[in-house]
Design a protein with these regions (language model features):
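Residue-level detection of the helix-turn-helix DNA-binding "recognition helix"
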Residues: 12, 26, 37, 67
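Residues within the helices of the helix-turn-helix
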Residues: 8, 19, 49
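Short alpha-helical DNA-recognition segment
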Residues: 16-34
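Short, basic-rich loop-to-helix N-cap that marks the start of a DNA-contacting helix
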Residues: 39-50
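Residue-level recognition of specific faces of alpha-helices
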Residues: 6, 31-34, 47, 61
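Short C-terminal boundary/hinge segments that cap the last helix of small helical domains
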Residues: 56-67
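A short, Lys/Arg-rich alpha-helix, primarily the initiator
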Residues: 1-16
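The alpha-helix within a helix-turn-helix
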Residues: 11, 22, 52
Length: 67
């Protein structure tokens, strides 16, 4: 079981680069890259909220549960 963060998919849909998202959200490119590559073990709700606002999406569009 795993929760996948589909950040790369949503960024591609919005035609947004990592550095642009980093500036909008206020998170380092390194930390966003960890989320994007699936290496993150956790994400704060405040971070998730900021990413969703910047990408104009819902949390369910970013997160996917795989059994």
């Amino acid at each position: 079981m795993a929760i996948i963060v589909n950040l790369d998919v949503m960024m591609a849909k919005r035609k947004m680069r990592l550095n642009e998202l980093s500036q909008k959200v206020g998170i380092t490119i390194a930390n966003l890259s960890i989320l994007k590559t699936g290496k993150a073990k956790a994400i704060r709700f405040s971070t998730l909220e900021s990413i969703c606002k910047a990408l104009d999406c819902q949390p369910g569009e970013l997160l996917e549960f795989i059994d």
